[in-house]
C-alpha cells in the first residue's frame, strides 16, 4: 500500500541541506458574522482597505467572506505570527462583528442574504464579481460560503539540484514540474490522511441544507445534523465539488497534458450552463457558458501553481515557467486556534509533501484519479469508524486505515529527523509523535474533538461560543510583528491602487470579457 521509499529516505539523510529553504504561505478564509452568528450584510470594512488590491486582507466569494493571505515565508513561526497579527488587526476593526471559527456556515436565512464580493467599477473588479455571479447561478451561493485554509508550499532550488540534477530554475523547469506532479499524484493517493487527522466539520447546522434533501444518512441532535464517524463534511458532496467536472479527464502526469485538459474545459460549451444565459439586456449572469468560466473554477484538493504576471492566466504562467509551488486545499478551519491553522498542521504538511515528492508515483489515468476519491470519501464520511479500511489502488484489496497511517508515519519520522537536524530542535519529531497516536485513538482526531466539545449545544452554539472567545482574545493581544501604522498604510495603498485601476478602465466591459473569458 505504502510505496517503498527507503532508498529515497536514505538519499535524503545523506543530503540534508537539500531541504534548507522550504517556502510556505497560508490563505485563511472566515465569514464575518453578527453577535448572534448570522451572516454579516455590511460592506467590507473600509478601514481594512480595498479587497481587490490589498495584499493581505481580501475577500473570497461573498462580501462577508474574509480571506487573509500571508507573504511567502521561510519560517513557520514567523508566518503564523504574521497571520495572527492580521487577525488581531481585523478583530479590532469589525465593530460588533466577529469571525466564524468553523468551516461550515450556520445561521444563514436564505441565499438572498449572501451578498457577492464587490470589487469596484474597474473591468477587473467587475470581472471578479461576475465570476462569482456565475458560481452562484451554477452551484448556489450557500456552497460558496464554506471556508477553508490553503497551504502553499515550495521546495528550494537546492533540493531539485541535488535530487534531479537541475542547474537552475529556468533550464530545470521541466524536471521540477515533473517532481511536483509526482507529489500531486501521491497526494491524491494518500492525502486522505489530512481529513482523517484534521477534518473538523463532522456536523452541520440543519439550516445549511435549506430544505434540500441529502443522500447522506444524517442523525439529528436539535438543530445539528451529523454523521457519527464523519471527519470533513466540507470535503463531501455537500461542499463544492462540481460533479460536472468529473468527466473532464484532467490528469496530473505531465504539465502539458494538465494544461491542455484545463484549457479544453474553459473552451468547451456546457448545455447545462448555457440554459442560464450569459447576458440579457446588458445584465450578465456568468462570464460564459463553458464547463469552466475560468481555470479557478476547477475543483481540486491540490493545485500546481506559478505566480502570474499581469494579464496572464494561471495555465499560461505554468507553461511559461513550470510549476513554482503547490497549493494544498484540503484543510478545514482549525477551530482550536483563533487563526484557523496551527504549527503542528504546518509541520505535518511539510513532512507529508516532502514524502509525496520522494515516493514513487506511477502515472494515473483519469479513471484511477476518480478511484482515489473512494478512499477520500470513506475517510470524509466514516473515517473514525472502528476497523475502517483503505482501498489499495483500484482493486478490491483493503488494509486497515490505522496500519496504513502508522506505516506512513514511520517514513515521516525519518523526514522529521532531517528537518530537525537543519533547525537544531526536535519539533518535527514531536509533531509526528503527537499525530501518529490518532491512529490508535480516534478521539485525538480533530473531528472527534469537535464532536466532544460541541456536546448538547450543537454546532451552532459551539461556533458562537468560540467566535466570542476568539474575538475577546484577539482584541486583547498586542500586535507582535506588524504595527497599526504599517497596516493603515497598506490599506491606503490598496485604495490608491484600486482608484488607479478604475481611472484606467477605458475599454468596454464587453470587450474585456471577450479577451479574458471568451465572453
From Swiss-Prot:
EC number(s) reported in the record: 6.3.2.2
GO molecular function annotations of the record: ATP binding; glutamate-cysteine ligase activity; metal ion binding
InterPro entries the UniProt entry points to: Gln_synth/guanido_kin_cat_dom (IPR014746), Glu_cys_ligase (IPR007370), Glut_cys_ligase (IPR006334)
A Gene Ontology term for the protein's cellular component: cytosol
Enzyme class: ligase
Pathways involved: Sulfur metabolism; glutathione biosynthesis; glutathione from L-cysteine and L-glutamate: step 1/2
Presence of the UniProt keyword Translocase in the record: no
Taxonomy, superkingdom: Bacteria
Recorded catalytic activity of this chain's protein: L-cysteine + L-glutamate + ATP = gamma-L-glutamyl-L-cysteine + ADP + phosphate + H(+)
GO biological process entries: glutathione biosynthetic process
Keywords from the UniProt entry: ATP-binding, Glutathione biosynthesis, Ligase, Nucleotide-binding
Membership in a protein family: Belongs to the glutamate--cysteine ligase type 1 family. Type 1 subfamily.
Protein name: Glutamate--cysteine ligase
Species: Edwardsiella ictaluri (strain 93-146)
